[in-house]
Structure formats: C-alpha cells, structure tokens
Amino acid sequence: MPKVIYPGTFDPITNGHTDLIERAGRMFDEIVVAVAYNPKKQPLLNLEERCELVRKATAHLPNVSVTGFSNLLADFVREQNASVILRGLRAVSDFEYEFQLADMNRRLAPEVESVFLTPANHLSYISSTLIREIASLGGDISEFVDPAVTEALQQKFSES
C-alpha cells in the first residue's frame, strides 16, 4: 500500500480530521499528517503547537506520523516518497476548490494521485473555524475535539 500525505492547517485538529486519519489508516500503510505553515495565514496556534496537538490526537494510531512543512505540497509529497494526497470533503461547497487543487497537483506531480474521503455524518459540520469561534466565546468544544485541543484553546483564550 502506498504512503499517503494528509495536508492541512489543522488550526486546530478536530474530530472530523481525526476520523479521516483513522479511516485512511485502515486503507494505507503509512499516513503522514502534514501541518502547513503558510506565512499568508495568521493561525491562532503556531506550527509547533498545531503539530503537537495533531500528535496527541493521533497518538493511538501506530501508522501515523506528523510533520510541519512550508514548501509546495507537490514537492513535499515527493520528498516524503509518497504517491497519494488525502483530502476531506465535508460538503459540495468543498468540491470545487478541492478539484482545482487536485488538478494543479496533478500538473505539478503527475505521479501523485489525490484521494477524497467524506467525514462521518455526525462530524460533517465540524470545522476548525467554527471550533475557534466557539472557543473564543467561551463555549464548550469538548464534543468536537481531542481533550488536548480543548485544553490548549482554553489556555490560549484565557491569555488574551
């Protein structure tokens, strides 16, 4: 089975992300969760914090590794000797953007395939953006994220 790269910002990782990683772990020998650093984005959590939270949320999965990256995804996939990019599709609205990304990645790295998974129904409405919003207003996010994420966001918002 090929190695798969699951890229994302993961600001923060949610149970929806973890569900996709768990399911991909049954399909592929090795999953590399690639936490993106994009200087054009202003994430709530820095790259190290995001990587650490992904590690904690996926610690129960023996075939998952976590690394940060800041270069072109097609180049990163090649550096990792992977042949598949995993992406999640929550709704039809995600499809057009993901389709464009897959086409561009195919142009840049023709040997790499993109695979799309949909989340479990009970997780399809969860997004990192919503989690940050709820947490910033003091809401309970524990149902939607790993306990380490709940703790990290509570701490982050109590500092501000």
UniProtKB/Swiss-Prot annotation:
Catalyses which reaction(s): (R)-4'-phosphopantetheine + ATP + H(+) = 3'-dephospho-CoA + diphosphate
EC code(s) of this entry: 2.7.7.3
Main localization category: cytoplasm
Any Pfam family matching the protein: CTP_transf_like
Residues that coordinate or bind ATP: T9, F10, H17, G88, L89, R90, E98, L123, S124, Y125, I126, S127, S128, T129
GO MF annotation terms: ATP binding; pantetheine-phosphate adenylyltransferase activity
Cellular compartments annotated: Cytoplasm
Keyword Cytoplasm found: yes
The keyword ATP-binding is annotated on this UniProt entry: yes
InterPro entries on file: Cyt_trans-like, PPAT, Rossmann-like_a/b/a_fold
Function text: Reversibly transfers an adenylyl group from ATP to 4'-phosphopantetheine, yielding dephospho-CoA (dPCoA) and pyrophosphate.
Protein family per UniProt: Belongs to the bacterial CoaD family.
Assembly: Homohexamer.
Protein's UniProt name: Phosphopantetheine adenylyltransferase
